[in-house]
């Protein structure tokens, strides 16, 4: 059965396949499991705690505590589900539990403090009560969301706080009279002090005005001298800049004159060099002309014979090249055929490897899905695979062949006669009942004949 909890609820599931308690907002609940729904919304608890101070003075502490499970802590929720969830949150059991914790901690804390300390340090007293109560509630997975501790109240027959209030009122009235008298005294003294201070401040201001006037005159003289000095420095700096610029200009003019003279000399020498080069080229051309004339006269016959020999050699070379190209073409075709055969073999092996990878990936996905289904229980996965692959049948077959000529122990059982319930629904229930009755003897027989224990989630064998 699939169950879903409300927004402020949790499912506490116990039973087969769960080690302790499983908390969830929604889950499948199997027949061998139990599910309890518990609410985690906080509840208000109102108390009037009677306590006694260190002076044995009783008092009443009205308080309203908003208490509920700690929803942000899984361990606390499991603790609450184990100890508190079987009881209704408004039940006397839970109410007495919370009230007992609050009263016990409040009384212990109040017994260590005087009434004066409790009354004057109310805020600290409330904080101490809150901290100590929270420490005790942690044992039950509960947390205090809000604690409203009201003003301390007298126990009937004891008027300590009433008298303490009257004392405070009288002290306030007396203090008010003292404050009025002190205010009048301070007013008269202050008036006289203000008059004296006025005269003192007037004389002080006159003296300071004269001093400031002299300081201003001195500062004006200093500023005038400073400005004149800066003007003189600026003039000297500009004169130096002009002298520097004139010097740089003279140096540049000298460099330009030098470059012009060097360029003129280089041009003259370049003309002379060019004339010499042209004369050399003319002489070379004359020598080449004479050489060509001699070649034409003496080497014409040798050239004809040379050309004839070259043509014959070229023809032989052409024939040999064609023969070599034919052999090379044949070798290339053989190499291409071998390459095509190797490519086909490689493609076949590659596809076979891809098939193995796809098979391994599918088997990995199958195993991960089975592990998720059994919540990462490897023993359950192993048993399922052995059943699904027929391992148990093969073991039984092997054992039967081994003991064929012996006298094995054969277990025969009968799960009783059929009891008709009626209809298709009755037939289905008979099959399920027969299956459950048949399962323990089968497991006993397997254990006796093979020594193999059934998985933990099926149950233990009867001894």
Swiss-Prot record:
It is a lipid-anchor. Its main location: membrane. May be palmitoylated. Residues 305-354 form a coiled coil. Keywords: Cell membrane, Coiled coil, Lipoprotein, Membrane, Palmitate. It comes from the Eukaryota. A lipid is attached at residue 35 (S-palmitoyl cysteine). It is found in: Cell membrane; Membrane, Caveola. GO terms for cellular component: caveola; plant-type vacuole; plasma membrane raft; plastid. Gene3D superfamilies: Band 7 domain. InterPro entries: Band_7, Band_7/SPFH_dom_sf, Flotillin_fam. Signal peptide: none annotated. The keyword Lipoprotein applies. PANTHER family: FLOTILLIN-LIKE PROTEIN 1-RELATED, FLOTILLIN-RELATED. May act as a scaffolding protein within caveolar membranes, functionally participating in formation of caveolae or caveolae-like vesicles. Belongs to the band 7/mec-2 family. Flotillin subfamily. This is Flotillin-like protein 2. It comes from Arabidopsis thaliana (Mouse-ear cress). The lineage of its organism: Eukaryota, Viridiplantae, Streptophyta, Embryophyta, Tracheophyta. The gene is FLOT2.
